[in-house]
Amino acid sequence: MPHSDELDAGNVLAVENLNIAFMQDQQKIAAVRNLSFSLQRGETLAIVGESGSGKSVTALALMRLLEQAGGLVQCDKMLLRRRSRDVIELSEQSATQMRHVRGADMAMIFQEPMTSLNPVFTVGEQIAESIRLHQNASREEAMVEAKRMLDQVRIPEAQTILSRYPHQLSGGMRQRVMIAMALSCRPAVLIADEPTTALDVTIQAQILQLIKVLQKEMSMGVIFITHDMGVVAEIADRVLVMYQGEAVETGTVEQIFHAPQHPYTRALLAAVPQLGAMKGLDYPRRFPLISLEHPAKQAPPIEQKTVVDGEPVLRVRNLVTRFSLRSGLLNRVTREVHAVEKVSFDLWPGETLSLVGESGSGKSTTGRALLRLVESQGGEIIFNGQRIDTLSPGKLQALRRDIQFIFQDPYASLDPRQTIGDSIIEPLRVHGLLPGKDAVARVAWLLERVGLLPEHAWRYPHEFSGGQRQRICIARALALNPKVIIADEAVSALDVSIRGQIINLLLDLQRDFGIAYLFISHDMAVVERISHRVAVMYLGQIVEIGPRRAVFENPQHPYTRKLLAAVPVAEPSRQRPQRVLLSDDLPSNIHLRGEEVAAVSLQCVGPGHYVAQPQSEYAFMRR
């Protein structure tokens, strides 16, 4: 049945009165109510709101992916203009017809790349499959196009990455693969669900620029789901604000940022962390929290005397971590990924040291190496005077009670067969800390501390949004009252209100219990807010380390300055330069086996502030 006359000529998508519900305990729970919007050709519509507001389920409903998950979808109209210019009603399409629509006419970049990529196929096979299916290309042509798309999203050694499996890539790399796959068939509508959440600011800038370029080339409509208001200001033409499943405000990006009408929109904007807000301050400051009655009151500075003088709780010296790459007919190790190269730092009780850098710079590997989740090839890791790198498995398990890890991908770190209450209570049982009733009470307290309800303990991970799952992982890490928490992108998946709550919670726990944090993040505004010291990593080495105020207010290394320059600003009138200061050819940290890389030499430029001496081998130093 033709629908061309029902869709305005300039529109590629129109939705009227979308309602989404789920059945729980034989009750219908509404997730989205009476949502209507349209999308013009070449336009970017940003959908923003808190975690659980209905943003992602709206996208899944458009892709017709909710029915198989038990979602109840009702809609008066859900029209799509395909690449062929034919207009179809999405709700009328069969499962077979939708397989031809997805990817070709409407593509989606999902929030959690590890669960969206098939672990048993290489990256190249997965991108090429979509190209072969929708473009009738041969296998060879599809692989050539797959390599070109990886180059487009700035993945170094793209030819090598084609033959890698998803688990062999960092979180940021996996997200770039997802973006390459979604853009490979040049769809009429691209739905991007938090596409840059896992990316550092420099790659984020390139991806946003890439989406803009392809959007202009193809007159592609983009629905951009995000909680990052800086990204919204940079990429959006119109903004739709959602709150508790309803659209509370919509307008142009200038109207939303300069004249917000709804109290929630005003509170959302007021809670956005601004880079430079900590200028002149030495200690971390609590985030303002969203309140509809009192939009984002400014919190007073923390009385921050948490750093304990004396011996560091964690001492790392010349840490080296490498991964072998095999090739050839005999499958021999011929090359190595130099993930971490001679990294050294100290962490004091009550201190927050942030590790920042691009995806693939070695941040996450450094954190994992500290707990021996990956084995290192050299260096020393000393916790409270005890060598971690030489401990037996039994002693290492006991030590992990004092050092906890918050992982980057919350869905992959929760057992889908266990309720979240069981997941949180498990470390208490393993270490024999609390009897049954006390452990259950502890779980309820932890859930409340991270902004969830005690009754959520009986639910399973798939019943929560991405942001809610990350809060569950944080509650689990806090269960044992550890001395050190390694937080790997712990708040990157959270919206600004929950992010503020979690950061404030971490600061409260640091003040009350003297917890030390190794905070791994690409969100420079959050890093500025929470850190005592900052270490900048590039190609597996620390190129600048020092007090947060010194690094942010007086960055000495060119790479540090480029990281700060790439941060999006939550102000539509203050656009970044069209070309963010990045080199055209990304250097690689893959080297021939036995080849040694010269370690950088750090030079003192101020109290506790050290910077790598200029060396010609850094690509970014040559520009």
UniProtKB/Swiss-Prot annotation:
Catalyses which reaction(s): glutathione(out) + ATP + H2O = glutathione(in) + ADP + phosphate + H(+)
Keyword Ribosomal protein on entry: no
Entry keyword annotation includes Membrane: yes
Enzyme Commission (EC) number: 7.4.2.10
Pfam families: ABC_tran (PF00005), oligo_HPY (PF08352)
Its membrane topology: Peripheral membrane protein
Keywords assigned by UniProt, alphabetized: ATP-binding, Cell inner membrane, Cell membrane, Hydrolase, Membrane, Nucleotide-binding, Repeat, Translocase, Transport
Oligomer and partners: The complex is composed of two ATP-binding proteins (GsiA), two transmembrane proteins (GsiC and GsiD) and a solute-binding protein (GsiB).
Family, similarity comment: Belongs to the ABC transporter superfamily. Glutathione importer (TC 3.A.1.5.11) family.
Protein name per the record: Glutathione import ATP-binding protein GsiA
Organism lineage: Bacteria, Pseudomonadati, Pseudomonadota, Gammaproteobacteria, Enterobacterales
